[in-house]
From Swiss-Prot:
Similarity field: Belongs to the PurK/PurT family.
Binding site residues for N(1)-(5-phospho-beta-D-ribosyl)glycinamide: 22-23, 82, 286, 355, 362-363
GO-annotated cellular components: cytosol
GO molecular function: ATP binding; magnesium ion binding; phosphoribosylglycinamide formyltransferase 2 activity; phosphoribosylglycinamide formyltransferase activity
High-level lineage: Bacteria, Pseudomonadati, Pseudomonadota, Gammaproteobacteria, Enterobacterales
Protein name: Formate-dependent phosphoribosylglycinamide formyltransferase
Name of encoding gene: purT
Length: 392
């Protein structure tokens, strides 16, 4: 049985978000709907989830001492990481002292970098993955590329949104790719993964919920990537029954091995009936923002329900839907959005994240749309996103 207190009262149930971006903002809103007290933590002030939290803190979350201090001060009942760049050793210590880390500290630590989760998936669970090697020096990087072969992809073991990633076709690109990877890691320069290129028909995110009433799957989410970050996503992605069954088997193995309750974004490559594991995030996934319009329970609502210990039951998918990012390029600390009225309409919504500034290219919002089919939904979402004019 789940007992929930009332926010700002002595018996309040407190949730602390470690990372307060647009995904954390939606988690905070779902917590608010249940009267939960929300504390948002990030490395910069006025982050999106801070706008809808009861309190907020600005710290370097890779600083274990600072992280322990804010957790000790706030005494949250649930610690909910939204990003990878966190002092996970401290989270494991705190979990050992009785605190509840979502989904669990081990999952957060293993998925903090690509090495932990790749070794779990390929070497412990025996799941199909791309060929790979790890390297922690430029010399070992050259050896890794030689072993994997061209073409290949290099990524920092800890990065997101395509930062530090390069697609390598020839030896002439190696020096530049190594340097770019060293600049793009979340925790600074360091170890990289070199991956062989997988031939696939499409990529999916299989949003997988581990809850008290078992493992549940959302309909597969298809998506298009550009420069290492998603541009559009849609649901459901059409695939064969056999491929879907294999995808669900892989996702089930991964989330049960990681442990804990919550929603996981399991990324997979699909080629015909074959499915290859790519990555997993033990939290809501950016491509899953489409579920804000496509399901009765969004990925954020499912995450909260699961980590609070509530049953999920069934997940209802309404039909073809899509999301398209609003991704302007400018420099401003006073961003405004014009022409939003022309973007919204029947079956079309816009979410603006409220990020405090932009310096270059940054995802500031998302358009959501339904359609008679996925193709129509994608067109409607892209058209809506393009109509929003961002100024600064």
């Amino acid at each position: 049985m789940t007992l929930l207190g009332t926010a700002l009262r002595p018996a309040a149930t407190r949730v602390m978000l470690l990372g307060a971006g647009e995904l954390g903002k939606e988690v905070a809103i779902e917590c608010q709907r249940l009267g939960i007290e929300v504390i948002a933590v990030d490395r910069y002030p006025d982050a999106p989830a801070m706008h809808v939290a009861h309190r907020s803190h600005v710290i370097n979350m890779l600083d274990g001492e600072a992280l322990r201090h804010v957790i000790t001060e706030e005494k949250p009942h649930y610690i909910v990481p939204e990003i990878e760049a966190i002092a996970t050793d401290t989270l494991r210590e705190l979990e050992g002292e009785g605190l509840n880390v979502v989904p669990c500290a081990r999952a957060t630590q293993l998925t903090m970098n690509r090495e932990g989760i790749r070794r779990l998936a390929a070497e412990e669970l025996g799941l199909p993955t791309s060929t790979y090697r790890f390297a922690d020096s430029e010399a070992s990087f050259h050896d890794a590329v030689a072993a994997v072969g061209f073409p290949c992809i290099v990524k920092p073991v800890m990065s997101s949104s395509g930062k530090g990633q390069s697609f390598i076709h020839s030896a002439e690109q190696l020096a530049q790719a190594w340097e770019y990877a060293q600049q793009g890691g979340r925790a600074g320069a360091g170890r990289v993964i070199v991956e062989g290129v997988v031939k696939f028909d499409f990529e999916i995110t299989l949003l997988t919920v581990s809850a008290v009433d078992g493992v549940h799957f959302c309909a597969p989410v298809g998506h298009r990537q550009q420069d290492g970050d998603y541009r559009e996503s849609w649901q459901p992605q059409q695939m064969s029954e056999l491929a879907l069954k294999r995808a669900q088997e892989i996702a089930r193995h991964v989330v049960l091995a990681l442990g804990g309750h919550g929603l996981f974004g399991v990324e997979l490559f699909v080629c015909g009936d074959e499915v290859i594991f790519s990555e997993v995030s033990p939290r809501p996934h950016d491509t899953g923002m489409v579920t804000l319009i496509s399901q009765d329970l969004s990925e954020f609502a499912l995450h909260v329900r699961a980590f609070l210990g509530m049953p999920v039951g069934a997940i209802r998918q309404y039909g073809p839907a899509a999301s398209a990012v609003i991704l302007p390029q400018l420099t401003s600390q006073n961003v405004t959005f014009d022409n939003v009225h022309a973007a919204v309409g029947a079956g079309v919504q816009v979410r603006l994240f409220g990020k405090p500034e932009i310096d270059g290219s940054r995802r500031l919002g998302v358009a959501l749309a339904t359609g008679e089919n996925v193709e129509e939904a994608v067109i409607r979402a892209k058209k809506a996103a393009s109509r929003v004019t961002v100024k600064g």
